[in-house]
């Protein structure tokens, strides 16, 4: 356990931030899973709607530093590729 006052405060903050980050990470993963489920079911409209909802959540995770911006681009690109493959 930390002895210095500022280190004690940082330890307290880290607990809160870890919980917040875990929640946000879970949320963006859930949105991705919703898109993948819609693609698997074969419903194009539901898949497009799910992707439209997921896109800003993924971008927000990247902007907040939860994931790297390149990873966000890669995830969105893969989802779009699945949507296009489903349409073809």
Curated annotation (Swiss-Prot):
One of its GO terms (molecular function) is structural constituent of ribosome. It comes from Legionella pneumophila subsp. pneumophila (strain Philadelphia 1 / ATCC 33152 / DSM 7513). The gene is rpsT. Binds directly to 16S ribosomal RNA. One of its GO terms (cellular component) is cytosol. This is Small ribosomal subunit protein bS20. Keywords: Ribonucleoprotein, Ribosomal protein, RNA-binding, rRNA-binding. NCBIfam families: S20. One of its GO terms (biological process) is translation.
């Amino acid at each position: 356990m930390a002895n210095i006052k500022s280190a004690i405060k940082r330890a307290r903050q880290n607990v809160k931030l870890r919980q917040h980050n875990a929640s946000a990470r879970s949320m963006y993963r859930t949105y991705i899973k919703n898109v993948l489920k819609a693609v698997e079911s074969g419903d194009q409209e539901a898949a497009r709607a799910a992707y439209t909802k997921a896109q800003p959540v993924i971008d927000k995770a990247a902007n907040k530093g939860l994931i790297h911006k390149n990873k966000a681009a890669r995830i969105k690109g893969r989802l779009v590729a699945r949507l296009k493959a489903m349409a073809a």
